[in-house]
Amino acid sequence: MGGEEGMAAGRKKRVGRYEVGRTIGQGTFAKVKFAVDADTGAAVAMKVLDKDTILNHRMLHQIKREISIMKIVRHPNIVRLNEVLAGKTKIYIILELITGGELFDKIARQGKLRENEARKYFQQLIDAINYCHSKGVYHRDLKPENLLLDSRGNLKVSDFGLSTLAQKGVGLLHTTCGTPNYVAPEVLSNNGYDGSAADVWSCGVILYVLMAGYLPFEEDDLPTLYDKITAGQFSCPYWFSPGATSLIHRILDPNPKTRITIEQIREDTWFKKTYVAIKRGEDENVDLDDVQAVFDNIEDKYVSEQVTHNDGGPLVMNAFEMITLSQGLDLSALFDRQQEFVKRQTRFVSRKPAKTIVATIEVVAETMGLKVHSQNYKLRLEGVSSNRMSPFAVVLQVFEVAPSLFMVDVRKVAGDTLEYHRFYKNLCNKMESIIWRPIEVSAKSALLRTATC
């Protein structure tokens, strides 16, 4: 674990008017932090990027593009970008905070969704993607992990890191990107493709997953997977209605020229059932001049950055952070085992000393064949996925929520979501001796029940 990652558990930070809290997401090139606007009290998500990392990996153009695209797209079903700030060594992207977790977590818990529920999410997805395409924006990495749910259960499309903005005179895209199981066959062929048709294919795979609980194209080795995708070789389970089956087959047409378009999807009888058009305000005038300014090294334009260090013990989680971890303002959602679905950020409670908790996690992780990096009550566990095709990693952090009461937050940072849920259940079983569960459940103690262990 890098020095900054290790120090994160022992410090508090303020960026401009934002009080920066715990890490709530992590990718290859960025971390997402929970933050609070000190002026308004509003909770936000702060995406933090390191300038040197961006330059060393030649990601400058892609990051500029992502920021520009997120400023352009303003839709109720798309995660909103509020502002972008530049520090001496960091770039801070302030985003709408989405508290309902990933859509894929519902699938991981329930197996599949009812047809009416799947249709609602698909309708919202198509509305959002149709809007993006009207702005000349193609997402190119649509998958359930990039589809979030707000506190009211509405869909929010996120992660425009692989998106592209159409240029005049350029008809076909040529960069292969996205997650293999969701990628259209023409994208895999590297012969150029239409971004709109490719996004439609991915939407079809997502609809299938929502209704089936598993992927239409899934193999242990990539050549066989690519062959099935290219041939459009799949079948719908018996519980799909005729209307849904017909629409999915028209979407998962391996020929992009005969594949159904978004306009045709919106006219489909199955799609239109119970459809409620989204109400949008007028498009805002978007100024992209500040995007370039973020990357200019002009010191007097840097946002103020203040860091204070604690005594090296576990971070104390305040009530506001606990509330924002739950759905809406219901604190019981933080630990209630009867939740409708499990968030990717799962957690458990222990009355053991913090050092004992960390030591136990280290021992258990090693028995599970995982490499352990530990510092300042924060641990990163690394391994490989069960199919050996991708890395698997989780981050655990110990928080003090009350005297002699600690919460361990567990987060997936790499790997398949379904595999993560299996890992978490196995971890809880192996750590049974330190996980605390109240014997009697009262209105007060219900707040301290574990999430899924």
Curated annotation (Swiss-Prot):
Domain NAF span(s) in chain numbering: 310-336
CDD domains assigned to the protein according to its UniProt record, in alphabetical order: CIPK_C
Any one GO molecular function term: protein serine/threonine kinase activity
Cofactor(s) in the UniProt record: Mn(2+)
PROSITE patterns: NAF (PS50816), PROTEIN_KINASE_ATP (PS00107), PROTEIN_KINASE_DOM (PS50011), PROTEIN_KINASE_ST (PS00108)
Location of the active site: 141
Keywords linked to the UniProt accession: ATP-binding, Kinase, Manganese, Nucleotide-binding, Serine/threonine-protein kinase, Transferase
Entry-linked SMART domains: S_TKc
Record field: catalytic activity: L-seryl-[protein] + ATP = O-phospho-L-seryl-[protein] + ADP + H(+); L-threonyl-[protein] + ATP = O-phospho-L-threonyl-[protein] + ADP + H(+)
Domain notes: The activation loop within the kinase domain is the target of phosphorylation/activation by upstream protein kinases. The PPI motif mediates the interaction with the ABI (abscisic acid-insensitive) phosphatases.
Self-association state and partner proteins as the record states: Interacts with CBL4.
Family per similarity comment: Belongs to the protein kinase superfamily. CAMK Ser/Thr protein kinase family. SNF1 subfamily.
PANTHER family named among the record's database cross-references: CALCIUM/CALMODULIN-DEPENDENT PROTEIN KINASE KINASE-RELATED, SERINE_THREONINE-PROTEIN KINASE CHK1
Protein name as it appears in the record: CBL-interacting protein kinase 24
Lineage, highest ranks first: Eukaryota, Viridiplantae, Streptophyta, Embryophyta, Tracheophyta
UniProt gene name: CIPK24
